[in-house]
């Protein structure tokens, strides 16, 4: 009881030693004593307890370009694509010769999705325009 802790009934330290210090002299606060719950088994520095099953070791999307690309689109875009797939206008008929026609959304939606994901309006024509302007400036300087 009180004799073990070294405190009298008022909570004062009656034996003179500092009960908040470990045997080696380091200060130990009550928070540190409560926080010392052990290794949670993960590779991180967050020790949350013995039976923690938090999958902190998994890095989702790293090395997966498709996952990053999907992450660039808004949730509303993905919802719209799903709704378009549900309300497929042509009744699900497929044309093996035209893969774009097999998609449940049209060319306009594809273009919008392409532009929202950072695509260029020029789609490769930018190189031709740049080379053309470069040659014009070169001939003007000669």
Curated annotation (Swiss-Prot):
Keywords: Membrane, Transmembrane, Transmembrane helix. Residues 1-123 are extracellular. Residues 1-74 are annotated as: Disordered. GO terms for cellular component: membrane. The keyword Transmembrane applies. It is a single-pass membrane protein. Residues 1-47, 54-64 have a biased composition (Acidic residues). It is found in: Membrane. The keyword Membrane applies. The chain crosses the membrane at residues 124-141. Residues 142 are cytoplasmic. Component of the acid-insoluble and acid-soluble organic matrix of the aragonitic skeleton (at protein level). It comes from the Eukaryota. Residues 65-74 have a biased composition (Basic and acidic residues). This is Secreted acidic protein 1B. It comes from Acropora millepora (Staghorn coral).
């Amino acid at each position: 009881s009180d004799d073990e802790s070294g405190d009298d009934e008022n909570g004062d330290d009656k034996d003179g030693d500092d009960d908040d210090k470990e045997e080696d002299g380091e200060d130990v606060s009550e928070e540190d004593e409560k926080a010392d719950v052990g290794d949670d088994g993960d590779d991180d520095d967050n020790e949350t307890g013995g039976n923690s099953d938090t999958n902190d070791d998994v890095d989702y999307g790293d090395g997966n370009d498709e996952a990053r690309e999907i992450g660039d689109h808004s949730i509303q875009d993905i919802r719209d694509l799903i709704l378009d797939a549900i309300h497929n206008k042509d009744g699900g008929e497929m044309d093996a010769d035209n893969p774009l026609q097999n998609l449940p959304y049209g060319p306009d939606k594809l273009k919008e999705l392409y532009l929202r994901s950072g695509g260029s309006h020029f789609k490769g024509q930018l190189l031709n325009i740049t080379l053309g302007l470069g040659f014009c400036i070169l001939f003007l300087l000669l």
